[in-house]
Amino acid sequence: MQFFGSLFVSLLGAAGLANALPSPGIPSNDKDLAIYPPVDANNTTSQDVVIDVVLFNGTEWISSRERFSLVSPGWASIYGPSGQSSVGSVLYSPILDYIDNAQLLVLDDVSFGVFSSLANSVTGYASNYTQSSSNSTSTMNSTGSVSGGSVYPTNSTTNSSISWNSSTSAATNTSSSSSSSSQSSVVSVNSEIFSYFGLSQQYVNYSTSRLCVVGTPRANMSTVSVTNNGSAVSNYTVNTNGWTSSNFKCVDDVVANIFGLDFYTAAVLSEVSILRSFALCNATTSSSLFRQIASYGVYGSFHFSSSESGSFANLIGTNNYFMTDVKSSSVVIVQSETSCSINSASMSSNTTYFYWNSTSSLSSSVFTNTTSSSNSTNSSIPTTYPSNSTTYQNITTSYPWSQPVVNITDYLSDNGDGHFVLAGDGNQTIGDFYVMNWTTIASGEYLVPFNY
């Protein structure tokens, strides 16, 4: 499988490659490291991981195998404001200084297979990683020799990452090992990384997940330089055109009032996005989704006027966006529906519209039985209110609720499917989210893990 290679990014000026990346040692005064306890990659007690970095330049998949230092264990939480705000707050590598919207992409077996097959044009180049400072001989080279701390390989026989191009198999780094044989296992490698992000196995399978870092080449870059085992250099033009996105009004306090502070915390403050990959059931959609993830990051919105995006309409109707505001997430987990039996009807045919405005208190009119022309199928909207509808009266916007005001399960189908549209004055969509098999999978403004 042709996939990962090694990426060096350079800023090109009048001197061409003269302004290339500095020696990739970890500076002690780096802005990421200044916030958290300092980590010295040259220290034999430091814990490093080797993770592949993937970019899509609009035409080709290009990638780099990079050494990351684990910076801040135990700070993240999937719920609450303590979640990590960036990959760089947990994993540090100099390459992050040249990439915007860096996210840790976590794939299961099925989504991994789709991603790797889509990215089969990755060149598979590999380059040496040479540390600066006193440990100048520490490299990640064709023999896989890395010193100066524990390095957890992610490309082993049981593979926790997408494998290299076979033509550069000498650079797979499989001979790297940690100080403990047990730590070199895939489960421990993933556990080490996930624990730093605060991800429990409730949300991600430690033993089968494949990891890579994806992001956007910074706008001031015009070229990515890829070295072939430290020798030949090939330059690839980077397409830095942004992705057009829609802006949706978000009334945070009303969201908290309707769905509760727990929902608000998970939806607005969580740094982890979980995609139930119903999109993987459609090859064209898969291509569009993963190319978007690897090139620009998952953010903004997927517009039907964009390349390949007509496939999204087949999945979720004619609404002009798929999901928004995932850009702020530091981790995107793609979990697959292996049967691929779920289709757009199971979501859009069971749609509930919640209406409010940003100035008046919430009332039972939030359940107004209204149809929307934005859906491709007729909506089945509940015509009766929950028995405790009186509790919806005179709710203020002061985050008083620790439990959701609306019991979402009252509006799910027997299969646990539902589509919830949050709308304000003039039927303006503020946000929406989808539930499949009792699990929140995708949203407008919100993409959150849900426990019912």
From Swiss-Prot:
It comes from the Eukaryota. GO terms for cellular component: endoplasmic reticulum. The keyword Signal applies. Residues 130-151 are annotated as: Disordered. Residues 1-20 form the signal peptide. This is Uncharacterized protein C685.03. It is found in: Endoplasmic reticulum. Its main location: endoplasmic reticulum. The keyword Signal applies. Keywords: Endoplasmic reticulum, Signal.
